[in-house]
Amino acid sequence: PGRKAELRTFLWFGWIRIANRIHQGSNDWNACIAHEMTHWQQYRRSWGLHPLRYKFSAEYRLRSELEAYAAEYASYRDCDPGRLHQFARWISEDYDLDVTLDQSLDLLSAELAS
């Protein structure tokens, strides 16, 4: 029962984030779900500590978002460079991280190449 409750809570917040992403202009549910499922995998890998590490560690938050946006980008059928730039902009502006757009774009490109 504990894991099911964790999953329900995570999915509830995940759907809120998916709705917000669609509101921001994303029109591909599968890509948004790939992003949020990556966060679920991070949660599982961290033995449930993902939310705390995400909140209190900018370095962890950056790595988490790079991995999630790379998964989202890879799930699109086209590899539109404009979309990659948009994701890099969101990473640099929306996550309280001390990274520039250029740094974010370089890091995201490296994540995709790995």
Predicted region positions:
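Helix N-terminus capping/helix-initiation residues
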Residues: P1, S57, D98-T100
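Hydrophobic or amphipathic, alpha-helical segments that drive membrane association/targeting
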Residues: P1-F13
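Post-HEXXH active-site segment of zinc metalloproteases
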Residues: F10-L11, I16-A19, N27, A31, ...
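Short, surface-exposed binding/anchoring microloops in extracellular/periplasmic proteins
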Residues: H23
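Histidine-centered divalent metal-coordination motifs
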Residues: H35, H39
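Long, well-structured alpha-helical subdomains associated
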Residues: Y76-S114
